[in-house]
């Protein structure tokens, strides 16, 4: 018998992906599955891709309430923003992983500016690849899973900022997302005739809700950074760059980003192109590309899910589809004096359900890779 887990809000895309991963997990046992307006329907009626798995045979969605979920040892919440906070308040003492934004931000003013509802508080931030994050997740009772754009962008930029290779106040992110990132509710702008063969920008001008989340996480990376060790330190010793900020400079430094999301004609995936002004001295080194890549090799060399691609190979969103993997690549644009980093994830995988399972594995002391894969689906 494995750990009994429940999924609240399993009728959406992220919730359905959670069910797919949990059904095949060697150490987790599905208990309650709830689905809001889908309550009473068979899981396989809403998610026909799950047909035939014994763990879901005859399983119907229950109502999303504390009584239905309370017997689980761990609860995944894949609910709309606002609903998670309300439900969590009814489950004191429960171990919860929340896939919504309700508990990601610590700044009350930023939360209310971007979400327009009262701040519910902040939980442990669940991006395991951040410095010290695994240790915090392992002892946490409640964890806020990061957003999809945030996950991809933070993975792309954190190594540069931690190593002092880029300016924290001159960062531009343009990221494309598949349509599943907008959820399952029908909308005219998500109709096939509107999306196929076309791309569009939205939430332009710094208004996307993942903006403060990205800034918060990257600011904490800078304020908690320490001098590099290993390969990156050796390369930087030759190539130059600014030392990681320490003392008052680190405490007073905040990250500012310009973030523009775009909608791409694909069902799933995130491709983030991130640029940042190079720190003084980096462009003058003998091999600026190697300097940047060394920071990523140092940060993710032991990561089971984040992979620095070989020199000259750039991330392709389809390569991580259906997986919990993330691919990154970095190069120096000497002409513009900027670092260029491209990263890709599956917005339903590492950007949502896969990452939630990764968090659960860490919380429960299981192998971090249990029930997960880095192998994408091709084509």
Task: Please tell me what each predicted stretch does.
Residues 263-265, 345-351:
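Glycine-rich phosphate/pyrophosphate-binding beta-alpha loops
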Residues 344-347, 357-379:
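C-terminal lid/capping helical subdomain adjacent to the catalytic/cofactor pocket in oxidative enzymes
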């Amino acid at each position: 018998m494995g750990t009994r887990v429940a999924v609240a809000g399993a009728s959406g895309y992220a919730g359905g992906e959670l069910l797919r991963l949990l059904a095949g997990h060697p150490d987790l046992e599905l208990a309650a599955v709830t689905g809001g307006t889908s309550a009473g329907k068979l899981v396989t009626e809403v998610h026909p891709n799950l047909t035939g798995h014994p763990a879901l045979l005859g399983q119907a969605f229950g109502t999303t309430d504390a009584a239905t979920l309370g017997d689980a040892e761990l609860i995944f919440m894949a609910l709309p923003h606002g609903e998670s906070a309300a439900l969590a308040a009814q489950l004191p003492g429960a171990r919860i992983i929340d896939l919504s934004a309700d508990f990601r931000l610590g700044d009350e003013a930023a939360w209310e500016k971007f979400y327009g509802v009262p701040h519910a508080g902040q939980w442990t931030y669940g991006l395991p690849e951040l410095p010290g994050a695994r240790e915090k997740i392992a002892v946490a009772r409640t964890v806020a899973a990061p957003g999809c754009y945030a996950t991809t962008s933070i993975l792309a930029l954190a190594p540069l900022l931690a190593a002092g290779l880029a300016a924290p106040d001159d960062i531009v992110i343009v990221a494309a997302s598949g349509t599943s990132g907008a959820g399952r509710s029908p909308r005219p702008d998500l109709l096939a005739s509107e999306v196929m063969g076309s791309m569009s920008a939205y939430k332009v001008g710094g208004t996307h809700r993942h903006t403060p989340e990205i800034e918060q996480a990257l600011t904490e990376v800078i304020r908690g950074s320490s001098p590099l060790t290993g390969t990156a330190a050796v390369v930087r010793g030759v190539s130059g760059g600014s030392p990681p900020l320490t003392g008052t400079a680190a405490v007073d430094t905040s990250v500012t980003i310009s973030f523009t999301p775009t909608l791409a004609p694909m069902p799933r995936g995130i491709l983030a192109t991130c640029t940042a002004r190079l720190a003084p001295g980096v462009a003058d080194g003998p091999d600026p590309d190697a300097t940047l890549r060394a920071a990523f090799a140092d940060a993710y060399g032991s990561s089971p899910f984040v992979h620095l691609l070989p020199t000259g190979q750039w991330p392709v969103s389809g390569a991580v589809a259906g997986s919990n993997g993330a691919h990154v690549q970095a190069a120096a644009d000497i002409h513009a004096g900027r670092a260029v980093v491209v990263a890709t994830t599956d917005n339903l995988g590492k950007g949502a359900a896969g990452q939630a399972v990764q968090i659960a594995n860490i919380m429960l002391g299981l192998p971090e890779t249990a029930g997960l894969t880095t192998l994408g689906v091709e084509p």
